[in-house]
Amino acid sequence: TRTQPWLSDRQLDDLHAQLLRQPNRTLLEANEAVQALLFKAQVDRNEITGEADPVVALIDFAHPQRNRFHAINQFRVDTPGCVKRCIIPDIVLFVNGIPLVVVEAKVADATAANPMHAAFEQLLRYRNGRPETKNAGLREGEPRLFHSNLLLVRTCGERCEFGTITSGHEHFYAWKDIWPESRRQYTPPLGVERQQELLIQGLLAPDTLLDVLRTSTVFMDIDAGRRIKVVCRYQQYRAARKIVE
């Protein structure tokens, strides 16, 4: 509302409802519909100027610094009527209060044979996506947290990989490059550059994150008409940016 102070409380409530309420849609269908809203949302009327059906910019893509970015640790979402009372993703990244990234972090120990796969399973559970639970007629997550989701991130030790809400376990990838070069001027917190730093400095930098959402995220049909969400990999993004320049 900082750049659109004309929005009334009623209109803000309506926009909030549009992001959360996607009746009779699968998570992927809801995600695609909400992504369209992130590019072009509308309300009935500008009550100050009288303009009908004005466009509302939920995110300012042209001026990333004008948006509000928050990272919330241990973000709790109550899930009444589900197998567990709540879900608590390790980190959720918000832009203007809209959750775009959900991160699950695991610790390597003797009890976890494959912590990265365990993180993937946890991300599935958070969005009620585990087939065995669905087939049993049970609910264990809150899909609405993922209506606006751009990226899922799983991390353990020095490893860190990203995917989308349709990515299988084998289709999570590391972001292996920091670009532009100006972002390399930082001090790794542990004195060594791990995959976490590469993803944070590269993909999760505010202007890059919003640029990837706006220019490098697509929904497409593949084998047997199955629809998926795809986000570019680091080499594709860098090549595209260099062509534009």
How should these model regions be labeled?
Residues 1-245:
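ATP-dependent helicase/translocase motor core
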